[in-house]
């Protein structure tokens, strides 16, 4: 019997409380698949350790990067920046059989399948502007006023691209080609939301410029999409757009998930539940 397709994101294992959650991330069925939609942590070795651990437990693990994996922090002995850092993370994933946006899409054969599981890496280009801004410069000014400038501005380097938005546009173009070749229904997996609508729930709307790109807004309509999984916002919930379920599956920081009360955060069932 096929297992379930589960999803989680924003584990942020740099926090001891979050790292302690790793032991509880185990399948209930040996055939369960797990999506990890970015922000495992910031330190290169931590990301590899977590993904290797999960790959040893689940039948299949699918990962796509968040912004935190792409940071280059002074304490990290791996000083790779930008695309080189991402490519090195992909190599680590392949060593443990974890699927990435650079691999052939895995096909889930559960009761709702076959369904392609498509991890996407599109980044952002500052086009999710808050009210009162129409340009990147205006959006950044509003974020500075609100005190919510994303740490990406300091730690996420776009090398060899001239800017994060240039890297984003290259990723969007490459991803669009891959999606156009899909011949199965797919679950789209992105760290950043594919639509602007989910960012309307942000406590600080000035943070939206770091949350995606308007270039991905039509992907869920242009393809046979069985569901969309994302993280980044630290607002776990399910919403519906154009008849398709969008699951935000983040754990978030300890102060966030502890405030929600109840049991420790668990992966969301996407298919097969």
Segment roles from a protein language model:
Residues 2, 96, 200-202, 206-209, ...:
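Binuclear metal-dependent phosphoesterase catalytic core
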Residues 1-6, 105-119, 240-245:
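Beta-strand-turn-beta hairpins that frame and shape the catalytic cleft
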Residues 7-9, 34-39, 62-67, 100-104, ...:
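Active-site neighborhood of phospho(di)ester-bond hydrolases with catalytic His/Asp-centered motifs
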Residues 118-187, 194-203:
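Active-site-proximal loop/helix segment associated with metal-binding centers of metalloenzymes
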Residues 83-147:
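Hydrophobic alpha-helical segments and helix pairs
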Residues 49-55, 100-101, 106-114, 135-136, ...:
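Short amphipathic alpha-helices and their capping/turn segments at secondary-structure boundaries
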Residues 17-21, 40-56, 68-96, 109-112, ...:
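Metal-dependent catalytic neighborhoods of phosphoester/phosphodiester hydrolases
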Residues 1-63, 69-74, 273:
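N-terminal active-site segment of His-dependent metallophosphoesterases
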